[in-house]
Amino acid sequence: MLPGRLCLVPLLLALGVGSGGGSGDGGDSRRRRLLVAKVNKHKPWIETSYHGVITENNDTVILDPPLVALDKDAPVPFAGEICAFKIHGQELPFEAVVLNKTSGEGRLRAKSPIDCELQKEYTFIIQAYDCGAGPREAAWKKSHKAVVHIQVKDVNEFAPTFKEPAYKAIVTEGKIYDSILQVEAIDEDCSPQYSQICNYEIVTTDVPFAIDRNGNIRNTEKLSYDKQHQYEILVTAYDCGQKPAAQDTLVQVDVKPVCKPGWQDWTKRIEYQPGSGSMPLFPSIHLETCDGAVSSLQVTAELQTNYIGKGCDRETYSEKSLQKLCGASSGIIDLLPSPSAATNWTAGLLVDSSEMIFKFDGRQGAKIPDGIVPKNLTDQFTITMWMKHGPSPGVRAEKETILCNSDKTEMNRHHYALYVHNCRLVFLLRKDFDQADTFRPAEFHWKLDQICDKEWHYYVINVEFPVVTLYMDGATYEPYLVTNDWPIHPSHIAMQLTVGACWQGGEVAKPRFAQFFHGSLASLTIRPGKMESQKVISCLQACKEGLDINSLESLGRGIKYHFNPSQSILVMEGDDIGNINRALQKVSYINSRQFPTAGVRRLRLSSKVQCFGEDVCISIPDVDAYIMVLQAIEPQITLQGTERFWRPAAQFESARGVTLFPDIKIVSTFAKTEASGDMRATGTAPKSAVLEEMLHNLDFCDILVLGGDLDPRQECLELNHSELHQRHLDATNSTAGYSIYGVGSMNRYEQVLHHLRYRNWHPTSLETRRFRIKCSELNGRYTSNEFNLEVSVLHEVRVSDKEHVNHLIVQPPFLQSVHHPETRSSIQRSSVVPSIATVVIIISVCMLVFVVAMGVYRVRIAHQHFIQETEAAKEAEMDWDDSALTITVNPMEKHEGPGNGEDETTEVEEEEEAEEGSSSSSSGSDDSEEEEEEGMGRVRHGQSGTSSQSPERSTWNTAGVINIWK
């Protein structure tokens, strides 16, 4: 009864039965959906995968297993029937049709003829759809997705064709050749059976030649030039379906009579002058083949520079400067820096100081202090290094750790590590459970011959988890093996980052190093949160010397050439000896460094000649030469500028501070030897050295504080970051000084130094501050002179009415030792500072009035004597009360000569004799006054003028202070 009832359901739905009144259309819809759900309960079912074969130019696809869909709703109409098969994919030349809805049988066929040469196989997705719950219902249910893979069966429709319409070879008489030349035919059919050439045949009869199934033609007897100069033979080819070539090819063999082959007209020693650009190495070279039967020539020019630095002449700037020069992103952490107080973990390692190369002999490692590298490297980071490594010692080699981050105590878990194992480079990265809780990639393996070739190579590991890419010498390498692992369980155990070995903190009686590295490392860095671009990677490892070809456009036709990434090896290949000769004459050496590493570069030229099928037909000796790179002219870097100046205390306290090097100049010169003009008269050429200015870059300038570090509570050195950024420089600041670094021109460094300022919030306790600048090029290879600067503070001196002020006019003894040439800055200072002579006269008048006001008879007599001698210089008399008197004195005016100073000293001595009687009551004040006078700092001599030439201005302030200015 149940099947019968189910069969009535679609009919009832079609007639609208059950849509009683009062419910409206909404009730009908709900009931209809309910009935549909009860009828069409199941989805169709098909196989999960199908394999098919279709013959080329046919439309029938033979599937295994056959295309049949089943539905558990059968035999219910519509719900248990199959209405369609749908193919998912774009522009697929197939369609699926339903042959029987009830049985679910279908057929897959091609829409149009299939061409095997266009595509050999197809893969797509197919699904089956039932007919829903009724004819009006669109809610068909679909099966799961099945994968269909179809292979196209080839038809032998193409005939073989030869790559060349004709071939030509030259042979020497009297020789039997295993192979004179090789002909080659191709077939455009897609299958191996019909696309491969199985046989070649010589069509021409009665010729002394034979051909094998690979197309190699040989002579069956010794050929004679006198008998026949040239042979012309026709050759055909057969594919593996025995279909012959559509057209035969012509082979022409020339017979040449029977010399010593080799390269001619080359020089063993080649001198290279730095800065001379691209210099040809073999301007006249040519190959003598002795008329050998040469079909092709391969020449390899190799520049051997493995013994120089890290494999070739590269820039020797510091790693930070190189990163900045190449445009690398900021945040690089140097794991093998130069040993210093701040980076002392490399102090115990073996190092080649000239190139900062660290050598590991399998017995030492270095612990990176905590805080140098962040604990979380994020999902993006970059590791870079130079590595030189040979075969691992021992039969079963252990892991050789380059970089390792492991548990410091208790356990022996490796969080991330980079190591070499059996000449394979392996990078380990274990995620924590708080970062991931699934089975994730953990070990990435690379197998490269260069890892153990004992040569320098540049490695960059770019991590964008879970993808890890290796760059070696600029080329990209994907890992050949990636293994997965579970994340590390969380713990509170601290981690230890090491270089050259891995720290084993657990599972041993005493924590120690293990898995030591054997080899050399340099420039090992890590950059958390960033990946390096291909452009920056190429820049960092680029060689500055190599082989070059002048005028590539002028190379002859048919010349193939190839450079290795460092341009130390050039391979040229061609079938024309003349073109090869001309191309080789254009090969040159270039060194783009302004100051290259002097010395020998060995050069080898090897040749491989093909003689119509033979591997090597004649033996050409190698060319062994060498390039002598001459010593570059060493620059003399000189820093020039004002070495000493004074500024008021208020300027030190201001927000801008004091500019330390407003006029500094950086000049680089070299000595050039020139012959004198009297060579004709004397017959000899006396040589004289002439200094010429040269332009080059600098990589750092250090400003050191002398006489003790800066006190950050009251003084500092300041430089706006914008001044550095717009000139592509960086800087570090500390209490010991300021360091500006980055590869830039001398003019850039000048401009930055012009803006360096010194501030002091409490200059009253400061007399002088001394600084020293030293600049460098090529990481200290060339250094400048040590430029010293002394900055002094001008102080205000405050005295009371009970103190003697006459000793203020005494010239300080250190003034005699200060001599400086006139500069613009000193002229500006002298224009706003009163002369010492004017100050002396005013102070004398003030003391005279002071003594008269005291009413001391003895002082009055002394002052009357003094007034008689200085009456001509007196300008005004002023009375003051017993309040304190502040006199601002600028001692920076220069004296005309020593005579003026002596006159002033005589006047002071006479004043002191006149007041000697009353000075006993203020002897204590004199001592304190002398201490204030010593704190005034060093001053410069100024030119003194007479009182009539230098009118003064005196003003009273509310505190009883007299400011005296010129």
UniProtKB/Swiss-Prot annotation:
Signal peptide coordinates: 1-20
Matches recorded under SMART domains: CA
GO cellular component, one term: postsynaptic density membrane
Tissue spec. comment: Restricted to the brain. In the cerebral cortex, found in the somas and neuropil of all layers. Expressed at highest levels in neurons of cortical layers 5 and 6 and, at lower levels, in neurons of the upper layers. Highly expressed in Purkinje cells. Also found in a few scattered interneurons throughout the granule cell layer and occasionally in neurons in the molecular layer (at protein level). Present throughout all cortical layers, highest levels in GABAergic neurons (based on morphology and distribution pattern).
Topology versus the membrane: Single-pass type I membrane protein
Annotated transmembrane regions: 836-856
Similarity comment text for this entry: Belongs to the calsyntenin family.
Name of the protein this chain belongs to: Calsyntenin-2
The gene coding this protein: Clstn2
